[in-house]
UniProtKB/Swiss-Prot annotation:
SUPFAM superfamilies: YebC-like (SSF75625). It comes from Deinococcus radiodurans (strain ATCC 13939 / DSM 20539 / JCM 16871 / CCUG 27074 / LMG 4051 / NBRC 15346 / NCIMB 9279 / VKM B-1422 / R1). The keyword Cell membrane does not apply. Belongs to the TACO1 family. This is Probable transcriptional regulatory protein DR_2548.
Length: 244
């Protein structure tokens, strides 16, 4: 789930069991192959969608061999290969939270039915297109373990829009088109980037705790387990003990 803490999300994904990790890898492989086909190239230097898909896969520790093989298969795929369409869905969760879902699907009817079923069974409600999308904006996010002033200066000088400091390090936000300029500048200056990818951030957050928080996390988990769902974003501000 994408929401309050990007560091908590990385910790949760790295701690996923084998079954969940395998499903997560499969989603990334699908995204990489779809990016190759839609962008018409297996070279990330000339295909920004592919570059973003690879960055997301690396953040979730997808092995380099898996990524390379996915690109090769997509480049060599013939006309009979499955065509996946990017589709977004919106809804509401416990505590008045907004939920924005990104999918890659070869069957829109199946996908919307699956998502609606999860909302109905897990205490949420599906919304119309545009009902909550306005509460999110696309941003580049870089996580850096080094929280020094020098690192922050490099980020700011190269286009960072906002920097949040925590015990884990820095969470740097950029305009989507500036993500790689900031990331490359940090790497060139000798800073080890934990992750860098395009994501959706809430413009405002809603504090959710207790039973509502637990119900929301369950709803998001079931949405994330759907094969066609790539990312689930919420505007929830969760207590740290609920995020872990």
């Amino acid at each position: 789930m994408a929401g309050h803490s990007k560091w908590a999300q990385i910790k949760r994904k790295k701690g996923a069991n084998d079954k969940k990790r395998s499903a997560m890898y499969s989603k990334h492989i699908r995204a990489i192959q779809a990016a190759v086909r839609s962008g018409g190239s297996g070279d990330p230097a000339g295909n920004l969608s592919l570059k973003n898909a690879i960055a997301a896969a690396k953040t979730d520790t997808v092995p380099a061999d898996n990524i390379e093989n996915a690109i090769k298969r997509a480049v060599g795929a013939g006309e009979g290969a499955a065509e996946y369409k990017e589709q977004t869905y919106e809804g509401y969760g416990p505590g008045g939270t907004a939920i924005f879902i990104e999918t890659l699907t070869d069957n829109v009817n199946r996908t919307v039915a699956d998502i609606r079923a999860v909302f109905n069974k897990r205490g949420g409600s599906m919304g119309n297109s545009g009902s909550v999308a306005w509460q999110f904006e696309k941003k580049g996010i870089i996580l850096l373990r080094d929280a020094s002033e020098a690192a922050q200066e490099v980020a700011i000088e190269n286009g960072a829009e906002d920097i949040q400091e925590s015990d884990e390090g820095l969470e740097i936000s950029t305009a989507p088109n500036d993500l790689y300029a900031v990331q490359d500048a940090l790497s060139a200056a000798g800073y080890a980037v934990e992750s860098g990818q395009i994501t959706m951030l809430p413009t405002n957050t809603v504090a959710v705790a207790g039973d509502d928080a637990r119900k929301l996390l369950t709803l998001v988990e079931y949405l994330e387990e759907l094969d066609d769902v790539q990312n689930v974003y919420t505007n929830a501000d969760l207590p740290e003990d609920e995020e872990d």
